Amino acid sequence: MTNRFPAPDYHFSYRKAPVSGNTINGLGEMSQRRARQVFHGSGARKLEWSALETFFGLTMPLQIYIRNALNRWELRKADGPLARKRTPVPDSAKMSKQLKSIARHAGAGAVGITPMTEYALYEGQTADYQSAIVIALPQNYETMRAVTTVKAAAETVDTYRDVSRIVMALAAHIRSLGWRARAYGESADLLHIPLAINAGIGQLGKHGSVIGTEFGSNFRLASVLTDIPLVMDSAVDIGVDDLCLGCQRCTIDCPADAISERQQWVRGKKKWYVDFDRCVMYFVKTFGCGISVSYTHLTLPTICSV
């Protein structure tokens, strides 16, 4: 069955197109380097595509704009003071289990721990922490079936708010033990996807998002960076590469024709990659799109495990 989504016809365009987002992202580069911010910037540098991002924000319905503003306001609590006395951690495995339990009790759908790497940071940014606790929070499946509409956009923003609250609470708990911890609830400052993959949340899919065993791709990510001693999880192989090679669901569904059938070299690594220039225009038109995340086969409730 073919889903009916808005056509990739745009009432907006650049008079002078900026440098390709694919170039900024390092498409075709054989040497490893850190990513550069290209959209949803943190203000660390002037983005080549900032005009489109501004347009995206200005054309958002008021309810979405307010939700985003409230999320940004709440993230002021991402960091905070440490307890004066540090609680020793003689058993890092026990501490890892406790923190995962706290996160799940707060609503997290999946939790993984991985060493922090500089390649999870954008070029020019620093974050001197030992490890990352990655949280995945599922979105409401039925609501997300309305992708490309304001209804689905509101669900996405609300899920980002909820997962941000989880990581802020978890970071605050770690700081109460006397250990440094900072919550990251947005992708503007941290690349959550590579951390999630390394933490065993899932694998990268053809559509550029993580596919996991519990929720498919229908979830949002946030992370806590910390120095508290923890036991690291490992990346998993759940057969996503083989699945994506034989599946064309997202490539067929994508109105912008932005999803490639083959892996490509990106900043020194061969992986699945979505054409930024094609994707971002449709993303802006449709309140954040979300088609591939919601309609990937493993997202469907009846077949969401492998």
Question: Would you name each region that the model predicts?
Answer:
Residues 109, 260, 285, 302-303:
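A very general structural signal that marks isolated residues within well-ordered alpha-helical segments
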Residues 231-291:
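Cys/His-clustered metal-coordination modules, chiefly Zn-binding fingers
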Residues 1-233, 238-241, 291, 305:
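Auxiliary alpha/beta "docking" domains used to position bulky ligands
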Residues 296-302:
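Conserved small/polar residues in nucleotide/adenosyl-binding loops
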